[in-house]
Amino acid sequence: MSWIDRIFSKNTTSNSKKSNVPEGVWTKCTSCEQVLYRDELKRHLEVCPKCGHHMRIDARERLVALLDKDSIVEIAADLEPKDILKFRDLKKYKDRLSAAQKETGEKDALITVSATLYGMPIVVAALNFSFMGGSMGSVVGSKFVQAAEKAIELHCPLVCFSASGGARMQEALFSLMQMAKTSAVLAKMKEKGVPFISVLTDPTLGGVSASFAMLGDINIAEPKALIGFAGPRVIEQTVREKLPEGFQRSEFLLEHGAIDMIVKRSEMRETLANLLSKLMNMPSPFVEPELIQEKSDDV
């Protein structure tokens, strides 16, 4: 074999090895830009193991990681959006819906379930940002209301994970109506003494932040989540000024009293269980039975 044949042979072998690596095995952190093994990132619940950056996570993956195994029962799973206004921008609304449904496997942006968390009954809603930016339309509003009413019926807490760009413009006034609708059912929950915990994730903006997302009895945020009404770019263009560093991020909002606490995704399950046990006047799931017995003997 001549020297030129050997070079071509090496190149061919190298290219063939590269092509054998399946797509999607590796990904890059959107913050530190470290190359990460996809399965490892999934094990860390989409949190970068190098820098701790919280990336966006699929709503169903979040629910499975949070709730007790085999306890999840979906609420209002049959609701599906309709193009009542025959809305069209660059595309028809019905085409956008079809594309989002095909991409995510969901009928709309909100998933609502009843389940248990460390054995405690709970109702949970989670917005999926991958479905049209987690935007709130009539189905999202209706599913949220049904979840809240289920929580009232069971007299158990409602927890909502928000990840949304706001109201869905393709539904116009129908989407704006959901702001009042969701706020009204939360007022009803308050009257009945049923707690609501709102968890704000990246991003929570627009009509969602201006309605149910900021109405929790306790408002929690994930680290460095973007939270506000308009995004920072829009604000800067409007006021023609540079915003402070970290403006509208979780840490800024906590410092200024707009939220109650910041909780890492890996600690969310235990934190929620502790909070809910206190709100519902139930024993903490992390107190050992022997300790409870010792306390009762002392009394």
Swiss-Prot record:
Root EC class: transferase
Pfam families documented for this protein: Carboxyl_trans, Zn_ribbon_ACC
Cofactor: Zn(2+)
Catalytic activity from the UniProt record: N(6)-carboxybiotinyl-L-lysyl-[protein] + acetyl-CoA = N(6)-biotinyl-L-lysyl-[protein] + malonyl-CoA
UniProt keyword annotations, A-Z: ATP-binding, Cytoplasm, Fatty acid biosynthesis, Fatty acid metabolism, Lipid biosynthesis, Lipid metabolism, Metal-binding, Nucleotide-binding, Transferase, Zinc, Zinc-finger
Presence of keyword Nucleotide-binding: yes
Subcellular location: Cytoplasm
ZnF bounds (C4-type): 29-51
E.C. number: 2.1.3.15
CoA carboxyltransferase N-terminal domain location: 25-294
InterPro entries from the UniProt entry: AcCoA_carboxyl_beta, Acetyl_CoA_COase_Trfase_b_su, ClpP/crotonase-like_dom_sf, COA_CT_N, Znf-ACC
Keyword Transmembrane helix: no
Single GO biological process annotation from the record: fatty acid biosynthetic process
Pathway membership: Lipid metabolism; malonyl-CoA biosynthesis; malonyl-CoA from acetyl-CoA: step 1/1
Record: residues binding Zn(2+): C29, C32, C48, C51
GO CC annotations, alphabetized: acetate CoA-transferase complex
Role noted for this protein: Component of the acetyl coenzyme A carboxylase (ACC) complex. Biotin carboxylase (BC) catalyzes the carboxylation of biotin on its carrier protein (BCCP) and then the CO(2) group is transferred by the transcarboxylase to acetyl-CoA to form malonyl-CoA.
Assembly and interaction partners: Acetyl-CoA carboxylase is a heterohexamer composed of biotin carboxyl carrier protein (AccB), biotin carboxylase (AccC) and two subunits each of ACCase subunit alpha (AccA) and ACCase subunit beta (AccD).
PANTHER family membership: ACETYL-COENZYME A CARBOXYLASE CARBOXYL TRANSFERASE SUBUNIT BETA, CHLOROPLASTIC
This protein's name: Acetyl-coenzyme A carboxylase carboxyl transferase subunit beta
Record gene name: accD
